[in-house]
């Protein structure tokens, strides 16, 4: 039996679909307030048997911060996919995010060890990969260290990884994946999926910052293949290609039938937008442009996926094809 955390998110919902399609017994962790209709909608992109497959999932309400609840959920579980995690670049969320990301990982690792779970797959992020020398793509051997440009999110994910490495030292069979920015259909109002909404609404600005991108189905494919292997005590970068924000936005615009060159946002423009956003937040109570996130708009990081390719012969879908597939679903969802 397989337990999945974070099953109501972009990655988790795609993973659940793959697992039930392969006739696995699946337990999915959720909060009482979780929106399961969003998961059903993800399923509908790929199958006409939404309800039949959805009924195969045993949904359970569990507080991942409560160790006793987590341990009880592990009874009869063979494999655990830990996809849950908070993502925020707002300073006000840093403490809560770090507490949840680290404590949930600690509780899951301890419960896996206590109940004898066979394998754990932990979803981390490329943000925990250390900085590479100029001109060299970052790889799994490069260790994260706090710096002026690091974010609270990257620190929380690094500390979460440390819990998994601690579990491995104590005898747990576990593997870690470090996906780049994940592109996939659904959840159009948040995360990387909002690229499509922004372009559809006429966004004209891009940014020179470069990072890795990967399709959600590739991430799921790599995860399940790693879980089915004997590999343990390793982490793997999952990145199809490195692109600038401008390049991604222009690919999205072209695929959605409205090709255009994006104007380059400058540091001065961005600083002014951040100041305006700070003033606006006095009235709204929420900042949209966090300084941490804004800094990444001009940073350039390249990643190597050579390790996963050599380990299991994994091949990534070209990011242009991923964008084309996602755009089809965006346009279908907004055809009215």
Per-region residue spans from a language model:
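Mid/C-terminal beta-alpha module of Rossmann-like enzyme folds, strongest
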Residues: 223-289, 305, 310, 319-320, ...
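Conserved NAD(P)H cofactor-binding loop of Rossmann-fold oxidoreductase domains
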Residues: 84-87, 124-125
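NAD(P)-dependent short-chain dehydrogenase/reductase
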Residues: 168-216
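Active-site Tyr-X1-5-Lys
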Residues: 149-175
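Conserved Rossmann-fold NAD(P)-dependent oxidoreductase catalytic core, especially the SDR/UDP-sugar
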Residues: 94-95, 99-152
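N-terminal Rossmann/SDR dinucleotide-binding element
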Residues: 1-79
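Substrate-positioning beta->alpha
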Residues: 159, 190-191, 207-227, 234
């Amino acid at each position: 039996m397989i337990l999945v955390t974070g099953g109501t998110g972009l990655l988790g919902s795609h993973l659940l679909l793959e697992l039930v399609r392969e006739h696995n017994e699946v337990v999915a962790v959720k909060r009482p307030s979780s929106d399961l209709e969003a998961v059903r909608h993800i399923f509908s992109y790929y199958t006409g048997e939404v309800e039949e497959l959805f009924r195969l999932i045993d949904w359970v309400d569990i507080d991942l911060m409560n160790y006793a609840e987590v341990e009880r959920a592990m009874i009869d579980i063979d494999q655990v996919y830990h996809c849950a995690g908070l993502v925020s670049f707002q300073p006000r969320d840093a403490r809560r995010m770090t507490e949840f990301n680290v404590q949930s990982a600690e509780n899951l690792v301890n419960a896996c060890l206590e109940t004898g779970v066979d394998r754990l797959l932990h979803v981390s992020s490329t943000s925990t990969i250390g900085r590479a020398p100029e001109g060299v793509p970052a790889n799994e051997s490069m260790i994260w260290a706090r710096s002026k440009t690091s974010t609270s999110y990257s620190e929380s994910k690094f500390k979460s990884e440390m819990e998994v490495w601690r579990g491995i030292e104590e005898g747990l069979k576990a593997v870690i994946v470090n996906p780049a920015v994940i592109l996939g259909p659904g959840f159009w109002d948040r995360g990387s999926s909002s690229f499509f909404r922004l372009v559809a609404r006429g966004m004209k600005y891009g940014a020179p910052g470069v990072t890795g991108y990967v399709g959600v189905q590739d991430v799921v494919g790599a995860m399940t293949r790693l879980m089915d292997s004997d590999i343990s005590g390793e982490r793997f970068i999952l990145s199809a290609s490195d692109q600038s924000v401008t390049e991604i936005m222009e690919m999205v615009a072209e695929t959605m039938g409205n090709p255009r060159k994006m104007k380059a946002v400058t540091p001065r423009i961005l600083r002014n937008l951040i100041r305006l956003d700070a003033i606006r937040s006095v009235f709204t109570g929420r900042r949209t442009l966090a300084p941490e996130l804004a800094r990444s708009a001009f940073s350039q990081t390249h990643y190597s996926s050579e390790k996963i390719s050599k380990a299991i012969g994994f091949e990534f879908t070209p990011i242009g094809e991923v964008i084309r597939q996602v755009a089809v679903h965006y346009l279908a969802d907004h055809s009215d």
